[in-house]
UniProtKB/Swiss-Prot annotation:
<feature type="binding site">
    <location>
        <position position="373"/>
    </location>
    <ligand>
        <name>Zn(2+)</name>
    </ligand>
</feature>
<feature type="glycosylation site" description="N-linked (GlcNAc...) asparagine">
    <location>
        <position position="64"/>
    </location>
</feature>
<keyword id="KW-0862">Zinc</keyword>
<feature type="disulfide bond">
    <location>
        <begin position="379"/>
        <end position="407"/>
    </location>
</feature>
<feature type="glycosylation site" description="N-linked (GlcNAc...) asparagine">
    <location>
        <position position="113"/>
    </location>
</feature>
<feature type="glycosylation site" description="N-linked (GlcNAc...) asparagine">
    <location>
        <position position="148"/>
    </location>
</feature>
<dbReference type="GO" id="GO:0090729">
    <property type="term" value="F:toxin activity"/>
</dbReference>
<keyword id="KW-0865">Zymogen</keyword>
<keyword id="KW-1015">Disulfide bond</keyword>
<keyword id="KW-0325">Glycoprotein</keyword>
<feature type="glycosylation site" description="N-linked (GlcNAc...) asparagine">
    <location>
        <position position="187"/>
    </location>
</feature>
<comment type="similarity">
    <text>In the C-terminal section; belongs to the venom metalloproteinase (M12B) family.</text>
</comment>
<keyword id="KW-0732">Signal</keyword>
<feature type="domain" description="Peptidase M12B">
    <location>
        <begin position="228"/>
        <end position="428"/>
    </location>
</feature>
<feature type="signal peptide">
    <location>
        <begin position="1"/>
        <end position="22"/>
    </location>
</feature>
<dbReference type="InterPro" id="IPR001590">
    <property type="entry name" value="Peptidase_M12B"/>
</dbReference>
<feature type="binding site">
    <location>
        <position position="363"/>
    </location>
    <ligand>
        <name>Zn(2+)</name>
    </ligand>
</feature>
Length: 431
């Protein structure tokens, strides 16, 4: 009798465990990450690929990319959620935003209560325009590295929800091969803080004929990038900047009157937590992982005037990129029309290195070029449920398309005719 009961119990337990296993398998297969590799990612690999800790819930797919080279065009195909994608990637139409020879420095906070800037012995000619490929249809910017005959794709496509593309780290590449890549969701906040700092009015109509060339002369925005992203190498941060700012540059391609181009004239990388005092002093006292976005701009006016004049004199605006959250959800801050002003040419964006800040960086540069929130103009910020404007006050992360409004395009054109935009006509680039 005891043996009979024991046998029944074992059979029941076996059936129960099998049922639980089936339920678990079904739930795994129905999840978004059903194409995850069967080898579990290590903590270091997860951080390297997604730029965040494993405690963060990230939606991603593990895909096999097939490529074909036809002259200078790369044909790329892959499948996500049963849907096939076929992209044509062409070499970037313009010079890379990060030319070979761009100054890269490090910043360290020393015990003398000051930030010291040091030259970094690092640059990489492989990240010039020949390595950047793009697709205007889905606003894709891809950095292609070719090593030993194998191509690796890292980048972002931002027409729809921000999607990052990442090649595999060494261990996984040895297991799965170089054709496998991760595609992951990298959407970030598009809610920001703006200040009106423009102090020079538009040029009077009777003087317009003297500077009419301004409206058609391309505007070159020379940017100094401040990277407060610790635990990343100079090589990796330079790669991130190349992809990130080429993606922003691509978003400005539809702007034609005047054309707007981005060039990075310097990168400064934080080497310790207090290196960038304008960010460090904007943190919340009760939680140092949170930052008050508006204070970064206020603090920056002093910080850049004190620490950067001796090192850099060839930039129209600085963009600080940091990974700290703002408890109010703000993803960026800047000053309207401040790009050529020595005290207002400051912008801040949140990005952890995953390209989640591409949209807000485009938005903030639009503000610096005197674009306002469309809700504050006669233009609607929502075309329909699927299309929002880039300068929407609080854009939708579910929109399938983002466009420049007619109000913003007019603001850019008018601003380019003023003395407040004079620096954008200067193509000087100090080597």
């Amino acid at each position: 009798m005891d043996l009979f009961i024991l046998t029944r119990f074992i059979l029941f337990l076996s059936f129960f465990m099998k049922s639980i296993h089936c339920q678990y398998s079904e739930s795994q297969e129905s999840g978004h990450n059903r194409n995850a590799p069967d080898k579990e990612l290590t903590t270091e690999e997860f951080q390297l690929i997604f730029h965040q800790s494993q405690t963060v819930d990230i939606e991603y797919d593990f895909i096999n990319i097939t490529t074909e080279m036809i002259e200078t065009e790369r044909k790329v195909s892959f499948t996500i959620d049963g849907k096939e994608y076929h992209l044509s990637l062409t070499p970037a139409a313009s010079q890379s935003v990060l030319p070979y020879g761009t100054k890269i420095k490090s910043a360290i906070w020393w015990t003398d209560n000051d930030t010291h800037i040091h030259e970094e012995d690092y640059s990489d000619e492989r990240w010039d325009s020949r390595a950047i490929y793009e697709n205007l249809e889905i606003m894709a910017t891809i950095l292609v590295r070719t090593e030993n005959g194998t191509s690796y794709y890292d980048g972002v496509f931002v027409k729809y929800s921000n999607e990052g593309v990442r090649s595999l780290p060494g261990r996984l590449m040895n297991i799965y091969g170089a054709n496998y890549h991760f595609v992951y969701d990298s959407n970030g906040s598009v809610y920001d803080v703006v200040l009106n700092g423009q102090d020079e009015p538009a040029v009077p109509a009777d003087m317009a004929s003297k500077i009419i060339f301004y409206s058609e002369t391309p505007c070159t925005c020379r940017l100094l990038i401040i990277q407060d992203l610790l635990m990343k190498t100079s090589r990796r941060l330079s790669s991130i900047s190349t992809i990130f700012w080429n993606a922003v540059n691509l978003r400005f391609r539809p702007v034609q009157h005047p054309k707007v181009n981005i060039i990075i004239t310097g990168i400064v990388i934080a080497k310790n937590e207090a290196a960038f005092q304008h960010v460090y002093r904007a943190r919340y006292s009760k939680n140092s992982k949170l930052v008050h976005t508006g204070r970064v701009i206020d603090n920056g006016r002093y910080f850049f005037g004190t620490n950067f004049d001796p090192y850099y004199d060839n930039y129209d605006a600085s963009f600080t990129m940091a990974s700290m959250d703002d408890p109010t959800g703000k993803g960026g801050a800047t000053v309207i029309g401040g790009i050529c002003s020595s005290s207002n040419n400051i912008a801040y964006i949140r990005d952890v290195g995953s390209y989640s800040g591409v949209k807000v960086a485009t938005h903030e540069l639009g503000h610096l070029l005197n674009g306002q929130h469309d809700s504050d103009t006669t233009c609607s910020e929502k075309i329909n449920d699927n299309i929002y404007t880039i300068m929407a006050k609080q854009g939708s992360t579910k929109a399938s398309k983002f466009v420049w409004s007619s109000c913003t395009l007019t603001a850019f054109a008018n601003f380019s005719k003023t003395t407040s935009a004079a620096c954008l006509k200067d193509t000087y680039r100090k080597q």
